[in-house]
Amino acid sequence: MEPQATEIVTPLSTCSAPRGRVRWILIFWMFVISAIAYLDRVNIAIAGHSIAQEFGLDNIRLGWVFSAFVFGYALFQAPGGRLADRFGPRKILTIGTIWWAVFTSLTALVSAGVAHALLTLIAVRFALGVGEAVVYPSSNRLVAAWIPTQERGLANGLIFSGVGAGAGMAPPLITFILVQYGWRWAFWISALMGLVVGALWYLLARDKPEEHSWVKPAELAHIKAGLPQSQVQKPLAWGTIFGSKNVLAISLSYFCYGYVAYIFFAWFFIYLSNVRGLDLKSSSYYGMLPFIAMAICSPLGGWVSDVLGKRFGKRIARCGIAAASILLSAVFLAMGPVAHDARIASIVLAGGAGALYLSQSAFWSVTSDIAGRSAGSVSGVMNMGNQMGGVVTASLTPFLAKHFGWGVPFYVAAAISVVGALAWLAVDPSKNLTNED
């Protein structure tokens, strides 16, 4: 049984924290974990050219390596969410960070000279995906317990701005390490960062606000008053989750979202260097732009959602913002490939990434709103759809580019974005999930 926070003596538990802000300290630390997780995820895209040369891989086989991570990540979303619901985000996220640090290190240890080197690399990346699968279902379980409904847009936006921050700092940081020390060191340093944030998370976090010694009565009352009164107390059955129109519609939209997002995570750096002809240094700087846009637009979209929610309700605040943002992303994606200048194309496509991330918090806020204590499980199912979109784009993008040119993958992504926006028309964020549904 998890001990009460007052019984745990650590250096952190004896410190003072700003009164009434403990929930935001945990959200900030989820931002940090999110950033490191995405740094660990996209470092292989930056080092992809060096790895491909050493292992003798073309873009198709390199796409298999990219897909292996996403496939493992996708398959374990729902189980990871259920684990977070059952054992709490504190323990599960700590185990996850240790797991992914180990397999990030093993990526660097794979040698091109061993038998079945490609299969070994694929297996290691698959296992890394399994470890990272617990991150966002765990964060959503934390949000469901710690964050009042009216603050969830901003909270989720801040957490997912870590995606842009981590992926944005990856190009210059990984490029510097790669040039100075070789690609393997990029993975060892990334692994060390994961271990550090995981250890600090275990010391700092608690699963519930009433378990944390820093939480004052006023903050606890504020949190409890803002939680949905009809939150589900018993775990939702899998049949209830998979049979929900809300969950299916959100998962479809998040599949489309993931398809688009993974073009930036897996292929954008390679697109700038190999297709647009930018040198390594320029590619690293312009490759940051989509992720900077993500880091800015994710909390911005969440904040706008919270503001609109107070005046117009959740349907406009969540569904309207998400649909409009994803449609705007489609416009930028269609315009980017026709820009003749590589730098202009980078800026336009970065606008598409930013517009996409204006919708990010809506997905996670709706799932925490409708699922209560099963928020980890429901968001895990939703995020499985997102990652399956990533599986498709990791392999389909180089295929389309090879046979039809590099403009086509972006046009296909724009069309898929339209489908993702339309799916939000079927979502009712005011309808809570129950096992009687």
Placement of each model-derived feature along the sequence:
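Cytoplasmic helix-loop-helix junction between adjacent transmembrane helices
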Residues: 124-164
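Extracytoplasmic gate region of multi-pass secondary transporters
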Residues: 44-45, 244-299, 360, 364, ...
